[in-house]
């Protein structure tokens, strides 16, 4: 198995959220995305179908039931993180069309520079408020097999997403 690339060690400031993001190797052979000092996502570049966090595994299991095994799907991801589920879908359902929406302009480009997606991943990135983008996409006639909502909703989240 080839060695996984090592992130540059740099951080990026997320201008909308006002916090820093960084990617670091972890003790499990993957990488974690930290935003504002809190771990948000885990990625295993050597095995994108391996999902470390239980809540993401549960989401992946739901996505597994959307269509027959291996069949491509159209998925809207509200919240980008380290793009763990888009990577999973490319590994398990090659040819899937995916759209990711995130409020922080810098996040997706940073994640892609540090942890490139698997070859052939069809991913469109939209910088917008997830709620507004979902409405706009629906009004534009876009249809998806599944919508994944993975946005922080605690005190650090956007005001309209809190509790």
Each model region followed by its residue ranges:
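Rossmann-like AdoMet
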Residues: 1-69, 91
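The AdoMet/dcAdoMet-binding core of the Class I SAM-like
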Residues: 27, 46-163
